Regions:
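Conserved C-terminal "switch" segment of AAA+ ATPases
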Residues: 174-248, 277
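Walker A/P-loop
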Residues: 34-71
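Canonical AAA+ ATPase core
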Residues: 86-88, 115-120, 128-204
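Pre-Walker A (pre-P-loop) alpha-helix and adjacent loop at the N terminus of AAA/AAA+ ATPase modules
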Residues: 5-38
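Short glycine-rich substrate-engagement loop in P-loop NTPases that contacts/grips substrate
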Residues: 75-102
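C-terminal engagement/docking regions of AAA+ P-loop ATPases
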Residues: 246-253, 273-321
């Protein structure tokens, strides 16, 4: 394990204090943040989705956070900040006061994301895709490192939510604690972790600076993809377009946009960078299935496709071995 891997592992251990059986979600959220992507946590109320989001603030030095519970009546003012009355009166400019709201935050948590109205959705598309917010006549570059969205349901069909859904590169289904001993430990644990607002006076020693964040992204994007990885990705892409579901006569086409594939590559490059690899290698493709499903019933099929694409070439190479 290289030094960066050790540091990230230590950071994740600290962040997960007081959170149970959410190590996978926290690790994926941190990977999304480092790659400049966003994550959607899908699951019923009370499964620690918000705790995962809150702890991520402490992964970064002096990070600011913003969280909001969406409703059908939420307004852009509540998310992006109120309109400055003084600017409107003196300069005749429609400018928002963004301090303390989403445009000023490093880590954002939006609960019940699909309840956002069209005006909020449109602004979020630009925020997620370009890290920009149009404030009056000015485009503001946002400090945003991670946006975590949560919901207990999939986006409704026919309501124009497809574009926003596509912006969340990683999608994870969250569950209640499954291990009985872990559940009992959670019941008696009175430790206040970062996710409960128990932030220590001193920042975590492993926390990531803005300079490191920028440098890691720049260096990771220079990593090449091996030919095996390109072949595996092509195989996965072709197979997800023809997935045979048990209850359907015709294969299902799991739609993955070209833009999504491009962002997936950035995610894989960051994973390779953290692992100290000189290039993106086939074993690092395993988390891909978190990026390639649109309906929960597709997950096991996508998992199988990804695993086959990674390990089939290895199996084939073994068949050509000759005994001494």
């Amino acid at each position: 394990m290289n030094k960066l891997q050790q540091r990230i592992a230590s950071l994740l251990k600290s962040l997960n204090q007081g959170i149970y059986e959410k190590e996978n979600e926290t690790a994926l959220a941190l990977l999304a943040a480092l790659a400049g992507e966003s994550i959607l946590l899908l699951g019923p109320p009370g499964v620690a989705k918000s705790m995962v989001a809150r702890c991520l603030k402490h992964a970064f030095v002096e990070a600011q956070s913003f969280e909001y519970l969406m409703s059908r009546f939420s307004t852009p003012d509540e998310i992006f900040g109120p309109v400055s009355i003084s600017k409107l009166k003196t300069d005749d400019q429609y400018v928002r006061v963004t301090d303390g709201y989403l445009p000023s935050a490093d880590v954002v948590f939006l609960d019940e994301i699909w309840k956002a109205g069209p005006a909020i959705q449109n602004s979020l598309l630009t925020v997620l895709n370009e890290k920009l917010f149009r404030n009056g006549h000015t485009e503001e570059h946002l400090p945003l490192k991670l946006l975590v969205a949560a919901s207990n349901e999939l986006p409704a069909k026919g309501e124009g939510l497809e574009a926003l859904w596509d912006r969340f590169l990683i999608r994870v289904i969250c569950h209640n604690i499954e291990n009985e001993e872990t559940f009992q430990q959670m019941l008696v644990d009175e430790t206040i972790g970062f996710a409960d607002g128990g932030a220590k006076s001193e920042p975590l020693s492993e926390a990531i600076t803005d300079l490191e964040y920028t440098l890691w992204q720049k260096e990771s994007r220079n990593l090449p993809l091996t030919n095996d990885v390109l072949l595996a990705i092509s195989s996965i892409r072709q197979k997800v377009q023809h997935v045979q579901m048990a209850d359907l006569e015709l294969p299902r086409n799991i739609y993955i946009s070209d833009r999504r594939w491009k962002h997936i590559i950035r995610l894989l490059k960051m994973s390779a960078y953290i692992h100290g690899c000189k290039s993106v290698e086939a074993p690092l493709l395993l988390p891909l299935f978190h990026c390639l499903w649109n309906e929960p019933d597709e997950i096991p099929h996508v998992q199988r496709i990804v695993i086959e694409a990674i390990f089939s070439p290895v199996a084939v190479s073994y068949t050509h071995l000759t005994l001494p």
